[in-house]
Amino acid sequence: MMSERIIRFLNGVGQDLEVATSSRGSSRHRAVVSMIGFFCEGRLSLQVIATLLVALLHIPRCFAQNLPATADKPWYSTQQNQFARRIEKYPEPTYTFEPGKTYTLAELVDLAERQNPDTRVAWQNAKAHAEALGVAKASLFPTIAAVALASTWRYGTLIDGGWQRQTVGLFQPTLNLDYLIFDFGGRSGAIAAAKADLFEANFAFNDMHRKVIYQVTAAYYRLLNAVGQEQAAKATLATARTVERDAEARLDHGLATTPDVLEAQAATAQADYDLQSAIGAKQIANGDLATSMGLRPGTNLLVESISDITIPEALSGTADDAVDRGLEQRPDLLEEVAKVRAADAAIEEERANYFPKLSFSGLGGLQRAYGQQDLFPGKYAGSETWNVQLNLQWTLFDGARREHAIAEAKARRTGAEAGINALRDRIADDVWAAYSNAETSLRQKQAAAALLASADRSYTAALRAYDLGVRNLLDVVAAERALAQARSADVSARTQVLAQFSNLAFRTGDLLRSAQPKGGP
């Protein structure tokens, strides 16, 4: 009865799978249907059918994780909620931050170096390479292991023409020692490669600090520019409102026309529009600075005013000096040099495989055993055990594996050398362009200062002439717009000098000079 129920159940499963097969077109489902039909028609034993049923119960697990059904629809699975819940296991770290405090650039850089997750990732990577160096050095020492063997077995043995049962038990604790005595530089090559990898990781760590410092510095100056633009827009709005009130007063006294007032009102509305744009740009710049420090974008940061910061007046040194500094101290270039050293060490490590290896192994311990046969009483026995051997291994043929391994290592070394040359060219070009941009920003700052002074005098003269009735309001509005543009250009020019000097320090690697040395693990 039970087998009949199972068969009926399997028939139902087969019908369901046939429906699924017709809708999904899976060859694997069709194979399962055929197998079920074969078993059900043959009326196999209950044990076989039950085994098949257990196997069928695991089929949903096989199809639980699948690919997207089509290319035009996103993939979705209930299992992705498990990944989403795992995010909660990694809470955001808490940082030291004082709301309401006006931060200098140096203070923000210090906070970013301690709080930016990218620096922690680079640090952990350097620590991992330091541990890898320790693993490589450990190969110079012997390996000692404690081993305890306990076993028992029973078998038949032939005694006096008959088979007798024999039982044996064994307990054997030992100390095993293995030591590679000499390998013609194989281990030293691995250690040299690990040291070069550690240098590479440390230089990458320093380069990450260089990038973080520049990200914070660039975002800081963008925020300074946004704050300055907001202040300039407020000043322009105040000027426009003054002109609007003057036009309305002159209209009341019959000295102005309605179009003059409308023109002044339009200028005020335009100034207010520009102010709102400046406020939005400041919010975005504030979010960029907070993000570069590892904080939430909504964190409100108070920074110094552009008027409180000393603007450089000239560049120190020539462009060639800047290029030379970049080629000497850029950590990413030093990282490429470390790759060449690692490739050299890998070549030496592979060459050692052409020579024999001499190793020593030995063990010593005690042995306690018990034995019994059906014809004789059981007995215990014990004694010390030891084994010592020298092993000389020399690979004579391996299908040219060593030749290919050395060729691969040499190719990697050649590629690393080419990487140095390519990066050297990019550094020289980047430094040269950054130096030229810095020089241009200095000249633009002087021109913007002269433009602001001229626009301010022009606006003052136009307003005075308008009050005297010798100029119309359109001339005043035009002078007002020119003054607003000059204010914006002056702020942009001053912050551009700071930004371009920072970019030059980033390209040459000078940003790391004033920072505390970051010597990785």
Where are the regions a protein language model picked out?
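A short glycine-centered flexible hinge/capping loop motif at secondary-structure junctions
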Residues: 251-255, 466-470, 507, 511
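Periplasmic alpha-helical coiled-coil/stalk elements that build and connect Gram-negative outer-membrane
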Residues: 203-325, 434-437, 441-444, 482-484, ...
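Amphipathic alpha-helical coiled-coil scaffold segments and their short linker/junction regions
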Residues: 109-113, 256, 260-264, 295-363, ...
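Terminal intrinsically disordered/low-complexity segments used for targeting and assembly
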Residues: 3-12, 46-111, 279-325, 505-521
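Small/polar, glycine/serine/threonine/aspartate-rich low-complexity segments that form flexible
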Residues: 85, 89-101, 147-179, 304-316, ...
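Transmembrane beta-barrel architecture of outer-membrane proteins
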Residues: 128, 170-172, 218, 263-266, ...
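N-terminal secretory signal peptides that target proteins for export/translocation
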Residues: 1-42
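A glycine-/polar-enriched beta->alpha junction
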Residues: 110-120, 127-143, 174-192, 203-210, ...
